[in-house]
Amino acid sequence: MAFDFGERRIGVAVGDTILGIPHPLATIDTAVTDERFAAIARLIEEWQPRQLVVGLPMHPDGEEHELSALSRRFANRLKGRFGLPVWLVDERYTSVIAEQLLEEAGVKKGRKQKPALDQVAAQAILAGWFEQPGTAV
């Protein structure tokens, strides 16, 4: 299960490690920490992932983004709350990839696209992890 962490929304994707195929799953649309983790707990209960993957925002030059510290904190909280292995993965360009995929699927840009964008970005993060696992938390 992968997460595209944001201050307002968290995109979620799931996938099969054997097949290496990720799928968009959900968008958690709240900034309230307890509500976020309750939603994540429900998804973990339902999908029973063996590992969690969190996108780590990076600038194009490889330097950490302003949100990197928040993503690391989120990853540590996931590990502490759910006791599953958590991986951090460079998420450079995942939003660009997600926008392109949605455009190809005919999803128009705008407010309605944002939840789907977060899910597809999480899908891209998970696809990247399948190709090259990141750093364990």
UniProtKB/Swiss-Prot annotation:
Gene Ontology terms: biological process: rRNA 5'-end processing
Entry GO terms, CC: cytosol
A Pfam entry, by short name: RuvX
Sorted UniProt keywords: Cytoplasm, Hydrolase, Nuclease, Ribosome biogenesis
SMART domains named in the record: YqgFc
Secreted as UniProt keyword: no
Molecular function in Gene Ontology: nuclease activity
Subcellular location(s) per record: Cytoplasm
Subcellular location, principal: cytoplasm
Protein name according to UniProt: Putative pre-16S rRNA nuclease
